[in-house]
């Protein structure tokens, strides 16, 4: 019996690096098309990868035209600029691992902002590294992350989901100029969760939800800000967002909401992989106790 258990444990331990290696092989590098050779070297260094490693990844290029296509209506052509520099490395993770984000030389978009917007676009189970050769806002990096995910998954992100994700990122940034950035990200995450859970699509009910959530978080919103959030929630209500996936993909964010005393009906949603490994370990312990 112990020999069988030893073999099982070896198999489990061997499977983990195999999954990680497979994920690395499928990684997608989305580079700003206007990077110079020196800027490219800086970006790769910030991402923690060598030229040799980069050569093994599937590489796509994000052009300035693409940035204007997706961002002009939200932030204006002059803000988008004329050079595509923001770059993204997307490394797929095993199912249930969730979505993680790290940033380098990004001075405007926060990790929580990226997470919220990427979840809206449908990105999941991935490690996303956003980097630029020098300090930039990072708004355009959302395009690189989504396009990298499309390349990896082989599925195109729905246009309405992409547009809503962009709108969410931009609105979060605008509100962040007048309010606390963490609070805004927490508020939008909570509102999105409630819309997904309850299928809310009535403007009056959404306005009531925004006001109640702001009160619980001790935030003071103007009528204009409330209206902007309601407009965003109406767009989110038209998307097929899975409430359970929101929690499992951004567990730290939703755990934080719980710590703030803001309850989510989907707290019962756990990480399947964690529960599976735990069950296997309990089974092994049960067998060993019989010897």
Regions found by a protein language model. Give the residues of each.
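Solvent-exposed coil/turn segments that connect beta secondary-structure elements
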Residues: 32-36, 75-76, 93-95, 104-106, ...
